[in-house]
C-alpha cells in the first residue's frame, strides 16, 4: 500500500508534525486538534510505503492512522530524548570554592 502524504509542522509546538493524505489535505483533521496544533505550516510531501523507515515513527502505525482516521499526529520527543544531562562533577567544575 503506497500513500502520498503531506507533512505539516506546528507553529505552536516545536517538534509536532501532522501527517495527512495529500489528496485530503487537512479536511479530515478534527477542529479541536487543529486548534491545539495551531497554524499548520506545510513542511514537505513524501511517498509512504510499508518498507519505508521513519526516524521517530512506526511506519505501520502511521499508515494505519492515515487509513482509519485520515491523519497521524507525531508528538515532540520527550525532553530526555534530546537533552543530554551532564555529570554533576562537570556542572560544578568552575564553581568558586
UniProtKB/Swiss-Prot annotation:
Cited PROSITE patterns: YCGL
Gene3D superfamilies, per database record: YcgL domain
Domain YcgL: 3-87
Matches recorded under Pfam families: YcgL
Coiled coil regions, renumbered to chain: none
PANTHER family: PROTEIN YCGL
HAMAP family linked: UPF0745 (MF_01866)
Name this polypeptide is given: YcgL domain-containing protein PFLU_1517
